[in-house]
Every structure is written in C-alpha cells, then in structure tokens.
Amino acid sequence: MDPALRSYHQRLRLYTPVAMGINLAASSQPLDPEGPIAVTPRPPIRPSSGKAPHPEAPRRSPNWATAGEVDVGDELIAISDERGPPRHDRPPLATSTAPSPHPRPPGYTAVVSPMALQAVDAPSLFVAWLAARWLRGASGLGASCVGLRGM
C-alpha cells in the first residue's frame, strides 16, 4: 500500500469521534418543543455610511427619510420601531401560514425523509479506486500489446 495512503487511513481511524472515546448520541441533548423560547437582544444598529455626523450639522427630523437618502441602519431602526417588540406566542423560526412567494418544484415535500443517510464506507471506496486503477493499467497494457499508442 502507498505510504501516503496508509498514513491517511491511520489518521482517519485515529481521529474519528468513536476512536477518541466520544459517544455523539449520548452527548447531544434531546430537543424539547415545549421548552422556553430563548430571546437574545439584538446588537445596536449603526448607520451604514460609516461616517460620524458633523458636530455642526443640524439634527434631522424623524421624517427626513422622505427625501430618499436614508441609510440601511436607519431603515432597520424604523422597521424595528414600527414592528414593536417580538411576539412570544411562537418560536422565532416557526413557519408562517402565508404561502411562499417562490413556487416549489413538483414532488417537493418539506417533510424530512425518515430514511437515515448511509455512512461512507472508506474501504469499499478504496477497493473501487484500486479496481479502476487496475482496469486503466490493463487497458493500457492491452493497447500496447496490440500496437496502439496512447491516445
């Protein structure tokens, strides 16, 4: 076996979570859908222009956005003031009842498939790689025996 490939397989076996003594299923906490909703404060929103206002500049009225020169930060502040505090009757990532503006392809379902994903079997991939390499070499040897040159 190629020394680099042997080293790769040794490291692969060495650093898997099971080899390191970590039981991933036991370390994960079960999800509680009735649990408390975690609400974190949003970071302060600053104007997106990046420039501090000039000290002698006149203060703008709250209605100055009608001129069309509002920054992104000011737009976000206005939207958050307009919406008010967050609602606590549903989780933040719950789906709304409004239909999606983007049509879904036929056969699309939002339900997760109950079929578990299969783990990648590294030894079988290695055997397939060896078989492909052998076939490539055998075809090259056969072509050279017949008298054909490399294409």
Curated annotation (Swiss-Prot):
A Gene Ontology cellular-component term: host cell nucleolus
Alphabetic keyword roster: Host nucleus
Stretches for region Disordered: 27-107
Main location: host cell
InterPro entries given in the database record: Herpes_US8A
Comp. bias regions, Basic and acidic residues: 80-91
Keyword Acetylation: no
UniProt-annotated location(s): Host nucleus, Host nucleolus
Domain of life: Viruses
Protein name: US8.5 protein
